[in-house]
Amino acid sequence: MNVAVLQFPGSNCDQDALHLFASGLKVPARYVWHKDTGLGSADLVVVPGGFSYGDYLRCGAIARFSPVMRAVRDFASAGGLVLGICNGFQILCEACLLPGALIRNSSLEYRCLTCELAVEPSTPSFGPATLGPTIRMPIGHGEGNYRIDPEGLARLRANRQVLLRYASNPNGSLDDIAGIRNETGNVFGMMPHPDRAFERFHPSQDGLAVARAVLATRFPEVLKRAG
């Protein structure tokens, strides 16, 4: 089992993401540069938080054209696991690997706080049965306001694609959405940071269970190991 953590100019959570998997879950993890055209032997690709390309034009709008994203699209199309965190979620939406878009917070302010999140029953490994009904993870973003058209929202609900909802909405996100997955259940995106919620000195350690639940989508033995 191997994890590939992407690095773009402006990424600033790549080290946190790698540390979450390498130290938190003891899974081999390595960096993949934005100019690379392959992902090696990755079993999970993590698109980390930060400000890729300085957030110029629009969050994630330039990163989607990076050479490595062609490899990520091919990887996801073949059923490979992909996790986008914060700016990574924005990039996955821009790349059409996840539906919808993330726009400026309704307050027009950058929000940085720990949020209580309701866990939705989305997949066998990602739901209240494995994570509990609520978890706590921090956010840090100016553009986390999730938007999608009414038909798209209906599909998200019908297919149980919503992973997490804010208990107290910090950014105006439609339907309190904090995280979603694609229809086939192998691409995950969320604005809260599991990579900032797993060390003993963090306000919460729930991020470790979130990362484990994503991995367990393809590798259920990860959950057994945790038990």
Task: Show the residue positions of the predicted features.
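Beta-strand-turn-beta hairpins that frame and shape the catalytic cleft
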Residues: 1, 132-134, 182-187
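N-terminal beta1-alpha1 cap of cysteine-dependent amidohydrolase-like domains
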Residues: 1-85, 94-99, 104-110, 118, ...
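Active-site-proximal beta-strand elements of phosphoester/diester hydrolases
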Residues: 3-4, 136-140, 188-192
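Active-site metal-binding loops of divalent metal-dependent hydrolases
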Residues: 50-51, 88, 142, 194
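Pocket-forming structural segment of enzyme catalytic cores
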Residues: 97-176
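A glycine-centered loop/beta-turn motif at secondary-structure junctions
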Residues: 177-201, 210
